[in-house]
């Protein structure tokens, strides 16, 4: 059996321990490695000729990407998970206790358990390569660093910096890591091993004291000051998580107890808290998202189809969506993009949009001005169909007008090659209708981005009846290169995300008309776990956009999609939301919120002809909106709009911010139980009408006591 860890000795007395997990592209830490590492450490202790040890990865572009998350599923109880953490503590403590200098030579991803391994070394040197990133992202999986990270990190970089890293899961670049004291040196990859060897030969060095601001020195240097830091962090966490995520509070407690009672006590608390989190429903849900997205990256979107290489893209329309799509095409996918718009203003807007985003990277020192300029050079513009003939894909982002989109299809078929894909960024028009104008309908597909394009991770790839498998696979691969998470959905009004969102938004509007206040509605859904409330979302998306989509959905999908009368009243008062500075909330000049705390525009109640009454329980408000979304998600599965519950969960989480700790609509239905959901829906149906009627699939599942997962 091939070993993961190989020890070689140099003539100068430095031993090199290379980690290379057989058959894997990246190194991950597995439980079964414990005995192998302990055996090697015993060998090192016995060999007096070894003067120093360097840890390095045998993989091309990663140090250690973290612990193997799948081993957590083998933990049947909290006791199993605690034993796993304690095993890590034993091995890392043994490494740290070696009486020779131990240096970690880091190139590529050094995350989670990988960084904890590096922290147990006496010194760290990393490459200055763009692929080198250091961090502890466990919180994103509902966990905490369980290999001593909550104890070693604050002792190395300071409490405030360590908490920031652990509570956000952010990844740190090499120069930043050096500045904060996380690594001792940053060098080109070509001399990484040589530098690590020299550091080991120079002998153990105590870490340089981290430069801290005067305030941090005063706070971190006393027990009283540390308590202020922990109390402030706890308050911020409670506000941000709304009590829905247990991991951040436990991370703070680990650091707090470790700093007050010593490393050993801190490690005991870490192992206990880690164990509780591993078996929590929140972490199980977050890990299911991780596994789902990992699995999806291996899929082409169309079985058996091979994607064609996209060497050039054309974007039709230089508006907000067009500019955003062009930007992610050039900056993320590194694919040349030609933007076509009928007027120069649209083109200058698209260029300006991309430049501002890249310039932020320069200001944050994530890239050099030369890199920014090279990426900008990938974007070109035109007001006519010039320089588009060799496009592999054309993404159309013009107005939601069927006749206009038909014209675009005809233009592209005339101007481009026979294999050029025509991808429409429509949010509501069925793709089959757009494809009616095509002589090559197999090349027509939907590619629905969400706004703002550079921030929203999801894209819906919409296949109509005649879309070819090759077109689907090529479009999915293109979206992935843009840094997106694509889900393939079938054609139909609203596709998946807007369809489930529409009923949720309609119900919120209905509650508003019944006298629930705007702030209360938004607070209730934020407390439930959404990033923003439904009324804020309507202001952001645009009340006019909602009003345009609603009748299309009602025509195609029936009476339950009938929008409340609120839209017409608001539009007749010229309220479109943030875009024109007039909506449910007040906006100052320049369309910026007048203060950090949003203020409701009280005059909107008069426009709607309502008077806010007594607010219902927040949980009742949230339930009424959310059950509509859940019911419709199951209908979408039944109608074949989405291929699987997994895709439905990912679409809702990444497309509309469905609370990740619930795992997505389908995971949440399993948690509630289909029988309980049916009872809730039937109760509302009796009270408010047939828009709450449970769909047939849910009734069957309730009767048969079945689950989605």
Curated annotation (Swiss-Prot):
The keyword NAD applies. It holds the Pfam family ECH_1. Residues 308-709 are annotated as: 3-hydroxyacyl-CoA dehydrogenase. GO terms for cellular component: cytoplasm. Its EC number is 4.2.1.17, 5.1.2.3, 1.1.1.35. SUPFAM superfamilies: 6-phosphogluconate dehydrogenase C-terminal domain-like, ClpP/crotonase, NAD(P)-binding Rossmann-fold domains. GO terms for molecular function: 3-hydroxybutyryl-CoA epimerase activity; enoyl-CoA hydratase activity; long-chain-3-hydroxyacyl-CoA dehydrogenase activity; NAD+ binding. Residues 1-188 are annotated as: Enoyl-CoA hydratase. Pathway: Lipid metabolism; fatty acid beta-oxidation. Its main location: cytoplasm. InterPro entries: 3-OHacyl-CoA_DH_NAD-bd (IPR006176), 3HC_DH_C (IPR006108), 6-PGluconate_DH-like_C_sf (IPR008927), ClpP/crotonase-like_dom_sf (IPR029045), Enoyl-CoA_hydra/iso (IPR001753), FA_oxidation_alpha_subunit (IPR050136), FadJ (IPR012802), NAD(P)-bd_dom_sf (IPR036291). It is found in: Cytoplasm. In the N-terminal section; belongs to the enoyl-CoA hydratase/isomerase family. In the central section; belongs to the 3-hydroxyacyl-CoA dehydrogenase family. Heterotetramer of two alpha chains (FadJ) and two beta chains (FadI). This is Fatty acid oxidation complex subunit alpha.
């Amino acid at each position: 059996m091939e070993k993961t860890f190989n020890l070689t000795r140099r003539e100068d007395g430095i031993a090199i321990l290379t980690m290379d997990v057989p058959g894997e592209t990246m190194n991950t830490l597995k439980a079964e490695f414990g005995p192998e590492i302990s055996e090697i450490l015993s060998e090192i202790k016995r060999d007096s000729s070894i003067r120093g040890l360097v840890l390095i990865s045998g993989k091309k572009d990663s140090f250690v990407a973290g612990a193997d998350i799948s081993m957590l599923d083998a933990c049947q109880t909290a006791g199993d998970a605690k034993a796993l953490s304690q095993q890590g503590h034993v091995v890392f403590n043994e490494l740290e206790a070696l009486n020779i200098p131990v240096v970690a030579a880091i190139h590529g991803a050094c995350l989670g358990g990988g960084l904890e391994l590096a922290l147990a070394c006496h010194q760290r040197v990393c490459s200055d390569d763009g692929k080198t990133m250091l961090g502890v992202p466990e919180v994103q999986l509902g966990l905490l660093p369980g290999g001593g990270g909550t104890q070693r990190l604050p002792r190395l970089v300071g409490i405030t910096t360590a908490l920031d890293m652990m509570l956000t899961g952010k990844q740190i670049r090499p120069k930043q890591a050096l500045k904060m004291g996380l690594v001792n040196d940053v060098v080109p990859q070509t001399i990484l091993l040589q530098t690590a060897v020299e550091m080991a030969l120079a002998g153990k060095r105590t870490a340089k004291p981290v430069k801290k601001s005067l305030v941090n020195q005063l706070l971190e240097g006393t027990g009283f000051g540390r308590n202020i830091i922990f109390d402030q962090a706890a308050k911020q966490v409670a506000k941000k998580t709304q009590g829905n995520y247990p991991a951040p509070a436990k991370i703070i407690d680990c650091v707090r107890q470790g700093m007050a009672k010593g490393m050993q006590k801190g490690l005991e608390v870490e192992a206990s808290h880690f164990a509780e989190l591993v078996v929590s429903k929140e972490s199980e849900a977050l890990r299911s998202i991780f596994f789902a997205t990992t699995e999806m990256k291996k899929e082409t979107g169309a079985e058996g189809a091979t994607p064609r290489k996209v060497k050039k893209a054309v974007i039709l329309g230089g508006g907000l969506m067009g500019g955003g799509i062009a930007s992610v095409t050039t900056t993320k996918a590194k694919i040349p993009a030609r933007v076509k718009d009928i007027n120069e203003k649209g083109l200058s807007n698209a260029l300006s949009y991309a430049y501002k985003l890249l310039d932020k990277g320069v200001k944050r020192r994530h890239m050099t001005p030369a890199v920014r300029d090279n990426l900008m050079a990938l974007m070109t513009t035109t007001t006519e169909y010039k320089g588009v003939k060799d496009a592999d894909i054309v993404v159309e982002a013009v107005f939601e007008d069927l006749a206009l989109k038909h014209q675009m299809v005809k233009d592209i078929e005339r101007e481009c090659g026979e294999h050029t894909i025509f991808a429409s960024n429509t949010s509501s028009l069925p793709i089959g209708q757009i494809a009616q104008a095509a002589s090559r309908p197999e090349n027509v597909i939907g590619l629905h981005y969400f706004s703002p394009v550079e921030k929203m991770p999801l894209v819906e790839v919409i296949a109509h009846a005649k879309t070819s498998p090759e077109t689907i696979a090529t479009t999915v691969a293109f979206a992935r290169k843009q840094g997106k998470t694509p889900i393939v959905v079938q054609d139909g009004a609203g596709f998946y995300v807007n369809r489930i969102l529409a009923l949720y938004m309609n119900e919120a509007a209905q509650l508003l008309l019944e006298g629930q206040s705007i702030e209360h509605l938004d607070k209730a859904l934020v407390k439930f776990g959404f990033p923003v409330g439904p009324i804020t979302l309507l202001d952001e998306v645009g009340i006019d956009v909602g009003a345009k989509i609603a009748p299309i959905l009602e025509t195609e999908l029936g009476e339950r999609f009938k929008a409340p009368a609120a839209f017409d009243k608001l539009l007749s008062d010229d309220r479109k939301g943030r875009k024109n500075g007039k909506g449910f909330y007040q906006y100052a000049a320049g369309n910026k919120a007048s203060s950090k705390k949003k203020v409701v525009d009280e005059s909107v109640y008069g426009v709607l002809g309502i008077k806010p009454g007594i607010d219902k329980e927040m949980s009742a408000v949230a339930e009424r909106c959310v059950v509509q979304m859940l019911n419709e998600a199951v209908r979408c599965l039944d109608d074949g709009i989405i291929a699987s519950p997994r895709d439905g969960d990912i679409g809702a989480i990444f497309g509309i911010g469905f609370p990740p700790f619930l795992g997505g609509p389908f995971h949440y239905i399993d948690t509630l139980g289909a029988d309980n959901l049916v009872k809730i829906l039937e109760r509302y149906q009796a009270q408010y009408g047939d828009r709450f009627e449970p769909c047939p699939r849910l009734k069957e599942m309730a009767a048969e006591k079945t689950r989605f997962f």
